[in-house]
């Protein structure tokens, strides 16, 4: 910034990932934490609660929100009809079973006497996938006479830690209707198959299981394999590579359909299969596939067919501000970097003109309960510097701690995670107030406020359907409208910036400033 440049008034959007609101104190890591900064802000500034789940974010009624959906709604300023909902509707209407891309993958494999390998997160969590979609894809291929092999990635993160058995039994029952035509041939925890932080040693174990049947253990059935994993102290998320029955590996001429609909944790394994110049690890076998199909577009640079292309999204807040010549910053640590960039921009990979991105590496630990502060302090250092610089009209930051540590199910670590975020927010608050700026503090969905699952009796590692905080910090008092949703945040930010709201944004302004 030159001396002649007028310093910009900062407008900061803080996304406290996975921090929802729950009145009950029991098993509530947020209420157990010491949060003097947030308490002070709630005393001095207006605050409310908004919805981040179900139909309010374009998901089925009662479905918990997630980070991808949350950030897309936050950036879009409108409720977006999610891939989960689109695909479920197509299955219900029968359209899915005639889908050109999916049918082509099956028929191409059949034409060369190859098999169809279906892989994905076998879970009813509905965050990265849904088991009903996997069942439908198996039915599509089986009814067309294909040989079908299922490679099950187990959840235990968006579902209770030990909850995979009913899902495995559901698929076993389906395959029993088609004797000798298909079965579950492998399973592995999502910790290995669905990394998103370039931990290629994990992904390699999943890849070798699929391409070489290289396994830590073998079992005669999927349920037996699960029992062996539990006996070894592994929960679903961490189940080691398990071969089911006789060895089945992906062969030349086979097709693969990856049934995850959320992109971020599907990219790495997909790249291992389709990239010619892949360098994550040394591939012992590289099958020459008839087709590799991504259920949705995991990344624009991945050269593979896509069943459900993203719907065009115009005038997200990022695009709109860029077109007006405004400047913006997106900042997060690795675990949530894609969310404040790709997802917040409605599925756009590239920066907009006037946009700057800062990526802070997440700590290299096995699970984040070992370092619950993660990289929050480093994120805050960079954010405060950016606020002080006067360079940016809008600054968007994600604090990953509540969600990533909440997913571990470790209560004491989750408390420390919340306290780390609160400490950081105290610093951000001081920086914003010093610049007479505006700040909205909210969350994409809940998680850390419920750490025990009362139905299963297990620790609660998944998201919740609770409302999330909405706090306004600024130089004047204000009134916040009730009944807000995540899609209202972008129009509200534009209102604070004294900019007209584009017609595409159907959300409403939630903040009325006192004159």
Curated annotation (Swiss-Prot):
Pathway: Carbohydrate degradation; glycolysis; pyruvate from D-glyceraldehyde 3-phosphate: step 3/5. Binds 2 manganese ions per subunit. The lineage of its organism: Bacteria, Pseudomonadati, Pseudomonadota, Gammaproteobacteria, Moraxellales. InterPro entries: Alkaline_phosphatase_core_sf (IPR017850), BPG-indep_PGM_N (IPR011258), Metalloenzyme (IPR006124), PGAM_B_sf (IPR036646), Pgm_bpd_ind (IPR005995). Its cofactor is Mn(2+). Signal peptide: none annotated. It comes from the Bacteria. This is 2,3-bisphosphoglycerate-independent phosphoglycerate mutase. It comes from Acinetobacter baylyi (strain ATCC 33305 / BD413 / ADP1). Keywords: Glycolysis, Isomerase, Manganese, Metal-binding. Gene3D superfamilies: Alkaline Phosphatase, subunit A (3.40.720.10), BPG-independent phosphoglycerate mutase, domain B (3.40.1450.10). Mn(2+) 2 binds at residues 17, 67, 444-445. It catalyses: (2R)-2-phosphoglycerate = (2R)-3-phosphoglycerate.
């Amino acid at each position: 910034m030159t001396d002649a440049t007028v310093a910009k008034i900062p407008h900061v959007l803080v996304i406290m990932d996975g921090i929802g609101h729950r009145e009950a104190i029991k098993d509530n890591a947020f209420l157990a934490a010491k949060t003097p900064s947030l308490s002070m802000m709630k005393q001095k500034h207006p605050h409310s609660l908004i919805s981040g789940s179900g139909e309010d974010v374009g998901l089925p009624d009662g479905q918990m929100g997630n980070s991808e959906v949350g950030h897309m709604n936050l950036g879009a300023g409108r409720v977006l009809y999610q891939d989960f909902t689109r695909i479920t509707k197509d299955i219900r209407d029968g359209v899915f079973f005639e889908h050109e891309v999916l049918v082509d993958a099956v028929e191409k494999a059949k034409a060369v006497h190859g098999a169809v390998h279906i892989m994905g997160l076998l879970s009813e969590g509905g965050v990265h996938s849904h088991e009903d979609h996997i069942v439908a894809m198996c039915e599509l291929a089986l009814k067309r006479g294909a040989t079908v092999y299922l490679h099950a990635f187990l959840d235990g993160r968006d579902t209770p830690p030990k909850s995979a058995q009913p899902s495995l039994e559901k698929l076993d029952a389906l395959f029993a209707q088609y004797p000798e035509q298909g079965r579950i041939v492998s399973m592995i925890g999502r910790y290995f198959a669905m990394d998103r932080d370039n931990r290629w040693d994990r992904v390699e174990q999943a890849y070798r299981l699929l391409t070489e049947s290289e396994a830590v253990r073998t079992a005669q059935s999927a349920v037996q394999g699960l029992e062996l994993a539990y006996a070894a102290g592994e929960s679903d998320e961490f189940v080691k590579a398990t071969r089911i029955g006789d060895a089945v590996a992906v062969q030349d001429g086979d097709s693969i359909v990856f049934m995850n609909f959320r992109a971020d944790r599907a990219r790495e394994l997909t790249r291992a299969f389709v990239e010619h110049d892949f360098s994550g690890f040394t591939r012992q076998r590289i099958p020459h596939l008839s087709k590799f199909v991504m259920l949705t577009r995991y990344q624009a640079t991945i050269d593979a067919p896509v069943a459900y292309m993203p719907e065009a999204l115009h005038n997200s807040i990022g695009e709109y501000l860029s077109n007006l010549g405004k400047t913006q910053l997106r900042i997060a640590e690795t675990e949530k970097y894609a969310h404040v960039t790709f997802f917040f921009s409605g599925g756009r990979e590239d920066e907009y003109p006037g946009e700057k991105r800062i990526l802070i590496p997440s700590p290299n630990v096995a699970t984040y309960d070992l370092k619950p502060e993660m990289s929050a302090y480093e994120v805050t250092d960079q954010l405060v510097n950016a606020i002080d610089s006067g360079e940016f009209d809008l600054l968007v930051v994600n604090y990953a701690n509540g969600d990533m540590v909440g997913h571990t199910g470790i209560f004491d670590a989750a408390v420390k995670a919340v306290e780390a975020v609160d400490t950081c927010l105290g610093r951000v608050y001081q920086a914003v107030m010093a610049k007479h700026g505006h700040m909205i503090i909210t969350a994409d969905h809940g998680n850390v406020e419920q750490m025990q699952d009362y139905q299963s009796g297990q620790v609660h590692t998944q998201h919740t359907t609770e409302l999330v905080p909405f706090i306004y910090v600024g130089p004047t008092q204000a009134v916040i409208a009730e009944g807000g949703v995540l899609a209202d945040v972008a129009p509200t930010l534009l209102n604070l910036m004294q900019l007209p709201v584009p017609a595409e944004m159907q959300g409403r302004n939630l903040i009325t400033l006192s004159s």
